[in-house]
């Protein structure tokens, strides 16, 4: 039964993440990069400066720009960086990392544009809360006649949160990491749903579900407070561990980079299979890249809309740093560590690949690396779960016109999905996530192209004011 389901999911995934969507994502990012004159490169320094400098006259919004960024990062830095990169490299080869980089470089412009539009077209609901996202700028930017497209986005946004990035993949990654550390041989097992699971999976799942339920009651303010504390510390810790692997194996780094580039273009495959290898690397790299940094997916704009700012461009600049931090820095460290240690070619899958890379790359006992890869996903994935509950709730709020009973009921359904996440197969979990990601991205990408003139005008006006020293 499970094999049939996996076959069906793989077929759907192949259609959703075929060449057309890959071309669309890269084309929109490249188009916006050219249209905005490389804003993600020319203003990257200013963007990082804005992260820690609150806008003094920002009156609209619920959280600071830094908190909004941390909320967005809390939903991106997690399983995608630790497990997603490993999955992409195992299934698509080392070249998948190259396509993740390329998608991130042009995707930074995409992230900038979508977060700018989120602030530009955000609304205030009947309770006085600021809400916004692709559904808002599709309806209010493109016009009421496009409301059907906004509803499609919101529907798939709920799917991504409930069945994709938000729950199944995160909890699956957490439980696998905990089980690999405490009970790698599955010595303590229990039968559930017709299958056998380790008790560590069941217990960790119960604890995680309880913790998530406690935080979700507090809404965006509590989520952002948790994210502001956890995300910077965990990201820095993981970054340090990855840098140590690279430094301890610095002589192998050039060969690893060469392998990544050659594999990206199928140069290591037989002549007849070069194109096929390249396409697979592109598909897996871009799909996992979108999963990780969410550029173009339309999720980050929902968090950006809550930022206390009067300047859409400013928040767009702050938000675009999330893609740079997530993929260019954190995913790169994971990917390079996996390639230079050869962990991707050892018959492992999921978090076990990254764990093996850390064990081989760090001059510490294997238990230390296992603990790092057990502890890090557990914390980072919790913040991803929290962030995606907020995103998907806003999507449901849009579809139901803010009916509170629906939101409260959905919250418990979301918590239930967190609970059942570990009992899904790894391959099925990631395939479901990929499918919903692709379907969610399409309406948002259409809107970004349609509203590119608004983004360009806002950007030009803001940068002109900087030149005139009206703002800094």
What are these regions (language model features)?
Residues 4-5, 35-40, 80-85, 161-174, ...:
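Transmembrane helix-loop junctions in multi-pass membrane proteins
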Residues 33, 114-122, 126, 243-259, ...:
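Extracellular/periplasmic helix-exit of transmembrane alpha-helices
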Residues 32-33, 74, 103-128, 135, ...:
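Helix-loop-helix module between adjacent transmembrane segments
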Residues 58-91, 117-141, 152-155, 159, ...:
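Alpha-helical membrane segments and immediately flanking helix-loop junctions
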Residues 24-31, 36-48, 171-178, 199-261, ...:
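Membrane-interface loop-to-helix entry segments
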Residues 38-65, 87-89, 93-97, 101, ...:
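Flexible loop linkers connecting adjacent transmembrane helices
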Residues 57-62, 93-102, 140-152, 186-194, ...:
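Membrane-interface alpha-helices at helix entry/exit sites of multi-pass transporters
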Residues 1-79, 89-96, 107, 419, ...:
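N-terminal alpha-helical transmembrane segments of multi-pass membrane transport
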